[in-house]
Amino acid sequence: MDVVNVMLAGGASRRFGEPKASYMYQGKPLYEHVKKQLLKRQTVIISHPSLLTFFKERGERDVWLDDEQVRGYGPLAGMYTAMQNKEAAWYLVTACDMPFIRRETAEALSSYCSEHVDAIIPLVQGRLQPLFALYHHRCLPAIDACLKENQLAMKDLIQKLKVRIVSEEELNATPNEFRNINKRNDLPENGMI
């Protein structure tokens, strides 16, 4: 299956107080905890400008800024940039602040890829998880439309797509895997969730 991992690391991290992607947790940057659990495929990192040097120093080669015309427009801008610049059928889009996700969950999610849907999104504890989801390349026109219409919420995009919702039971996932980190005290000291 033709899939590229897309890690979104372009946010301002206002509540966290510093860039989350580079925050050291248990001896390595937060983004590395996420990256090691993604599909065994190429990973493209969509970076905040202030982190470009950091990622390059960590040996990351596929690190891009959002395309200039959509820079600052949130996750949709990152998805747009990845789809415009890296050809693939599917994109596993994830945030850099979900360090408890498991590769098994990513693999289970990818097993639902089908030509009959545009996106495969987990539903965990009654909430959609659009920032750990698979999007087909054919979503690009809908993403472009959302950006042009200044509809920047993920729910705006989801309403335009044929979506396969996958429950946490179908993924054999735990709800804690999908916790995103907004403040330092969201990270347990011992790494256990």
Swiss-Prot record:
Main location per the UniProt record: cytoplasm
Cofactor(s) listed in the protein's UniProt record: Mg(2+)
UniProt KW Magnesium keyword: yes
Any one Gene Ontology molecular-function term assigned to this protein's record: GTP binding
GO biological process: Mo-molybdopterin cofactor biosynthetic process
Annotated keywords: Cytoplasm, GTP-binding, Magnesium, Metal-binding, Molybdenum cofactor biosynthesis, Nucleotide-binding, Transferase
Enzyme Commission code(s) on record: 2.7.7.77
GO cellular component: cytoplasm
Primary enzyme class: transferase
Compartments (UniProt record): Cytoplasm
Residues that bind Mg(2+): 97
Binding site for GTP: 8-10, 20, 66, 97
Keyword presence, Transferase: yes
Swiss-Prot/TrEMBL catalytic activity: Mo-molybdopterin + GTP + H(+) = Mo-molybdopterin guanine dinucleotide + diphosphate
Family indicated by similarity: Belongs to the MobA family.
Entry comment, domain topic: The N-terminal domain determines nucleotide recognition and specific binding, while the C-terminal domain determines the specific binding to the target protein.
HAMAP family, per database record: MobA
Function: Transfers a GMP moiety from GTP to Mo-molybdopterin (Mo-MPT) cofactor (Moco or molybdenum cofactor) to form Mo-molybdopterin guanine dinucleotide (Mo-MGD) cofactor.
Record-given protein name: Probable molybdenum cofactor guanylyltransferase
Organism of this sequence: Bacillus pumilus (strain SAFR-032)
Lineage of the organism: Bacteria, Bacillati, Bacillota, Bacilli, Bacillales
Gene name per UniProt: mobA
